[in-house]
Amino acid sequence: MNQAELQRHMEEVSLQFFQKEFRHQAVFNARLRTTGGRYLLKSHNIEMNPKYLENFGLAYFIGIMKHELCHYHLHLEKKGYQHRDQDFRELLKKVDAPRFCATIPREITMHEYTCKSCGKSFLRQRRFNVNRYRCGSCGGKLIQTDSKKIYTENP
């Protein structure tokens, strides 16, 4: 999905669920990490996280769109648009939008190092120069044996 398709989807979702037009811009923002989208109060634009579309699919992504459109329409109507406001919670229930997003699994590269002398192995996230460091147990030389990707739930 590109920016134009996102804009079209946002306008369609707004008309279908809120019976109101979406008159501002919807854009992808890949820098968003722990949030599915955000409504910008000053410009009234909505930024969406493309990783949620990739990881969870279009149906879940439309739920996030509905959540952001709740902020959008309530703010323009000068009603309570924040998560704690009663107007916001009622509109979320009415349009069946999620209150929170699921976390995206994060990809971490783990590097395995092994001691040549004692055979002890350990994992590190950051690589290091094996010529500058020694084994903490026996003082032997270290070698990098493996690098693997691990997916975690925490952001």
UniProtKB/Swiss-Prot annotation:
This is Protein SprT-like. It is found in: Cytoplasm. InterPro entries: SprT-like_domain (IPR006640), SprT_Zn_ribbon (IPR035240), Uncharacterised_SprT-like (IPR023524). The active site is at E68. Its cofactor is Zn(2+). Residues 7-145 form the SprT-like domain. The lineage of its organism: Bacteria, Bacillati, Bacillota, Bacilli, Bacillales. Zn(2+) binds at H67, H71. Keywords: Cytoplasm, Metal-binding, Zinc. GO terms for molecular function: zinc ion binding. One of its GO terms (cellular component) is cytoplasm. Belongs to the SprT family. The keyword Cytoplasm applies. Binds 1 zinc ion. GO terms for biological process: response to stress. SMART domains: SprT (SM00731). Pfam families: SprT-like, Zn_ribbon_SprT.
